[in-house]
């Protein structure tokens, strides 16, 4: 942190606390009176005045029960203390295409403070039908770098780390270190199994999804769960289906993945665990089935 020359670190924190107390205002939420709030312009001004990083200002505000205005419509479904928990959470998204791009956007809007993006590929024109991060201007750009730029523009409180590489058995522990949850947004069965083994070794939950045409599937795998081997086995003799990748399916399943990640991070609800959720959007069908005990 680099603040004004005449202020040491302690003084900067004290000055920030006082500024936050002076700036916060009351706001009317969707269900009546909301917590005191602070807006983006005020946060940016504090950043320039005190030299405090913007993510740190968001965190300091939440610690004092002050809700950044951008999160007002998360409240009261997400409490201020839960918003603080999200701000200090670390999520890994492996794959930044049809599933991963939307997961990243949703998590950034929700306020997950640290996002790690893993994807070695570049955008192609055939991605434009469904991949939330792709535009004609992003063609040939790396998905990881594009994700970083989009997310940081969308929410400057989010810190983005990128790995424009393929996840492997050798690098997975480095990438997954200190994360709280990971998302499987891959399209290779073997890569999914490599990721799952990494999350088991790292001791964190994995939220899996896959799509094919109008069909999507979703499951959250905790380290002690049998997980994806119940679906794919070793994966050696399986070939991916080819009914296309539609935007409705990709965005639906991606947001369900983001919801599962939210459950994990906040310890809320009932994760779809040891159970597969399947959706067939054309017929409007949604089912859950449990796997038989091995």
Language-model regions: role of each:
Residues 79-122:
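Glycine-rich adenosine-cofactor-binding loop
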Residues 255-270:
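Oxidoreductase and adenylate-handling cofactor-binding alpha/beta cores
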Residues 149-170:
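S-adenosyl-L-methionine
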Residues 2-91:
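N-terminal charged helix/coil linker that caps or initiates catalytic domains
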Residues 59, 119-155:
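Glycine-rich phosphate-binding loop and adjoining beta1-alpha1-beta2 segment
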Residues 268-280:
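Core catalytic loop region at the nicotinamide-binding pocket of NAD(P)H-dependent oxidoreductases
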């Amino acid at each position: 942190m680099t603040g004004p020359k005449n202020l040491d670190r302690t003084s900067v924190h004290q000055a920030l606390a006082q500024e936050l107390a002076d700036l916060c205002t009351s706001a009317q939420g969707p269900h009546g009176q909301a917590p005191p709030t602070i807006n983006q312009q005020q946060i940016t001004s504090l950043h320039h005045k005190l030299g405090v990083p913007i993510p740190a200002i968001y965190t300091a505000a939440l610690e004092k029960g002050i809700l950044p205005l951008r999160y007002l419509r998360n409240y009261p479904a997400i409490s201020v203390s839960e918003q603080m928990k999200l701000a200090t959470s670390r999520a890994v998204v492996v794959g930044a295409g049809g599933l991963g791009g939307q997961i990243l956007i949703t998590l950034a809007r929700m306020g997950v403070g640290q996002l790690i993006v893993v994807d070695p590929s570049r955008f192609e024109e055939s991605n434009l039908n469904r991949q939330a991060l792709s535009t004609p201007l992003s063609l040939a750009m790396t998905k990881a770098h594009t994700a970083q730029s989009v997310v940081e523009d969308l929410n400057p409180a989010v810190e983005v780390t990128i790995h424009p590489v393929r996840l492997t058995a050798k690098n997975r522990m480095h990438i997954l270190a200190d994360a709280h949850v990971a998302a499987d947004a891959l399209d290779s069965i073997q890569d999914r199994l490599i990721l799952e083994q990494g999350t088991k070794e790292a001791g964190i939950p994995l939220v899996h999804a896959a799509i094919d045409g109008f069909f999507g599937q979703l499951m959250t795998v905790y380290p002690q769960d049998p997980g994806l081997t119940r679906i794919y086995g070793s994966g050696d003799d399986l070939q991916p289906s080819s009914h296309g990748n539609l935007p409705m399916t990709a965005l639906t399943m991606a947001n369900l993945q983001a919801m599962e990640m939210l459950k994990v991070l906040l310890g809320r609800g009932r994760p779809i665990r040891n159970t597969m959720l399947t959706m067939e959007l054309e017929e409007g069908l949604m089912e859950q089935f449990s796997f038989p005990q091995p």
